[in-house]
Curated annotation (Swiss-Prot):
One of its GO terms (cellular component) is cytosol. The gene is aroE. Pathway: Metabolic intermediate biosynthesis; chorismate biosynthesis; chorismate from D-erythrose 4-phosphate and phosphoenolpyruvate: step 4/7. It catalyses: shikimate + NADP(+) = 3-dehydroshikimate + NADPH + H(+). Disulfide bonds: none annotated. InterPro entries: Aminoacid_DH-like_N_sf, NAD(P)-bd_dom_sf, SDH_C, Shikimate_DH, Shikimate_DH-bd_N, Shikimate_DH_fam, Shikm_DH/Glu-tRNA_Rdtase. This is Shikimate dehydrogenase (NADP(+)). GO terms for molecular function: NADP binding; shikimate 3-dehydrogenase (NADP+) activity. Belongs to the shikimate dehydrogenase family. It is an enzyme of class 1 (oxidoreductase). It comes from Xanthomonas euvesicatoria pv. vesicatoria (strain 85-10). Coiled coil: none annotated. GO terms for biological process: amino acid biosynthetic process; aromatic amino acid family biosynthetic process; chorismate biosynthetic process; shikimate metabolic process.
């Protein structure tokens, strides 16, 4: 029986844990697959994806900085991908790529089921407005948060995200210079790559953003999450959570789309958490 081919596309992508995660999912479910990492700069992504399809690729994950490009290349889109304006999962069907976004479902599943958080009624600060932020914002709204404030270094992108979400009563954008005026939040989500340079000062955020219930969540993991989580602990956030659980859960969502079966994420998460020192950055 031929082995089906899958891949994760990104730039850079050598650090990605997705090949290890999907290989373990395959072993667990008895599904034979070949899953590799393919480095593709933005300008080469379309051609690289076409080569992958020509060579028999059945599905792909997409990480930074290609999620919005994947959205544009998909022939059809799921509702959640359309709302996000970004794609992290591609399914090959009848010679066409179908785009989906499992990031938000992965984040909410990790926060509610693994971390035990009730997201209902929380006021949320979302840092960033790129593909990662777009992927999680709709799912957070669906989970029952009260309000979301989007802050991004480029205000135009924050405005565009808010417009796309279409819930002006719950979602607003503010300038990064306004952080001290925003009050406190029960959930602060870092959807930026500002920690990639390991700059401890990258997250000199006002302490007034934090209250006694605040959960601070970085969508990154490993070294890239260190600066934000260090701020969260110094600010005495009740929870400081990295993106490893989200990574595993969104991968399980993608796996289910491709294979029709959802794997058990707990053993894979536990194994990766035990290797935490070697983790680098987020998918």
């Amino acid at each position: 029986m031929p082995v089906s081919r899958y891949a994760v596309f990104g730039h850079p992508v050598a650090h990605s844990l997705s090949p290890a995660i999907h290989t373990e999912f395959g072993k667990q479910t008895g599904i034979a697959l070949d899953y590799t990492a393919i480095d593709a700069p933005l300008e080469d992504f379309s051609a690289a994806l076409q080569r992958f399809a020509d060579e028999g690729g059945k599905g792909a994950n997409v990480t930074l900085p290609l999620k919005e490009a994947a959205y544009a290349l998909a022939s059809s889109l799921s509702d959640r991908a359309r709302l996000a304006g970004a794609v992290n999962t591609l399914v090959r069907n009848d010679g066409q790529w179908q785009g989906d976004n499992t990031d938000g479902a992965g984040l909410v599943r990790d926060l509610t089921e693994r971390q035990g958080l009730d997201l209902r009624g929380r006021r949320v600060l979302l840092l960033g407005a790129g593909g990662a932020a777009r992927g999680v914002a709709p799912a957070l709204l669906e989970a029952g948060i009260t309000a979301m404030v989007v802050v991004n270094r480029s205000p135009e992108r924050a405005d565009a995200l808010c417009d796309a979400l279409g819930e002006p009563a719950r979602v607003t954008s503010r300038y990064i210079e306004d952080l001290r005026e925003l009050g406190d939040f029960e959930l602060i989500v870092n959807a930026t790559a500002a920690g990639r340079d390991r700059d401890a000062g990258a997250f000199a955020l006002p302490l007034g953003l934090v209250n006694s219930l605040t959960a601070a969540v970085d969508l990154n993991y490993g070294d890239t999450a260190i600066a934000f989580l260090a701020w969260a602990r110094a600010a005495q956030c009740r929870y400081a959570i990295d993106g490893l659980g989200m990574l595993v859960e969104q991968a399980a969502e993608s796996f289910a789309l491709w294979h029709g079966v959802r794997p058990d994420t707990d053993p894979v998460y536990a194994a990766l958490r035990a290797r935490e020192a070697v983790l680098v950055s987020a998918d």
